[in-house]
């Protein structure tokens, strides 16, 4: 299975879902602005994947910050949050992830953490958002595999499946019972261009 999104060499790397299935292309993001563009232009799709991207974009922006104090770092943090919040107003997980990052940032600020500690806390939280999403997807796959017959015709609506992450239909995840290709028709109806 293609990885949807991850960290590589200090960058956020995501599969360009607009190019699938004909080509496997990866987009590398070095700033929150680049992550925001990837979300806005639908390089990455599916609300949970968008939430993961937002958390990683925030952490990425702080990682590259040269702020000498926590006040300046906080300004950069909230600017990155606002930038990412403007990308997809219907993606619930986007706002959930941003609020989660804000809560952790505020707690770390109240605890008197240094700029380096704040940066580390944000990256750790973004990794946590990602890891929890992967675990949730695996659980959805296990539960779905138990109720969907092996020989089933499945029509999904919007972005369901491995690349959307967290979607209600994840039966073809490698950690769950696979739905054999000849036995199941997987079709998707996009909800927007």
Region spans (language model):
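Positively charged, low-complexity intrinsically disordered leader regions
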Residues: 1-33, 37-40
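N-terminal active-site beta-alpha-beta segment that forms phosphate/nucleotide-binding
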Residues: 43-193
